[in-house]
Amino acid sequence: MATNIVGKVKWYNSTKNFGFIEQENGGKDVFVHKSAVDAAGLHSLEEGQYVIFDLEEKQGKAYAVNLRIK
């Protein structure tokens, strides 16, 4: 799907291991799972933190992968 999308962490719950990123371009909020956070070498995401990510689709739903801190 799309690559190098800029977004802001809307919320991330490290207990539930997921959250959502608000796309800077105004698109739909994107699901982010702990596996993507771990793969980026991060421990967690903070609300309001800017990230760059790629979109992938699985079972008809978009989710963030290849996270990088902006």
Curated annotation (Swiss-Prot):
Keyword Cytoplasm: yes
Main location: cytoplasm
Keywords: Activator, Cytoplasm, DNA-binding, Transcription, Transcription regulation
Cell compartment(s), UniProt: Cytoplasm
Aminoacyl-tRNA synthetase among keywords: no
InterPro entries (UniProt xref): Cold_shock_CspA, Cold_shock_domain, CSD, CSD_CS, CSP_DNA-bd, NA-bd_OB-fold
Residue ranges constituting the CSD domain according to the UniProt record: 7-67
Cellular component GO terms held in the UniProt record: cytosol
Pfam families: CSD (PF00313)
Top-rank taxon: Bacteria
UniProt protein name: Cold shock-like protein CspA
Gene designation per UniProt: cspA
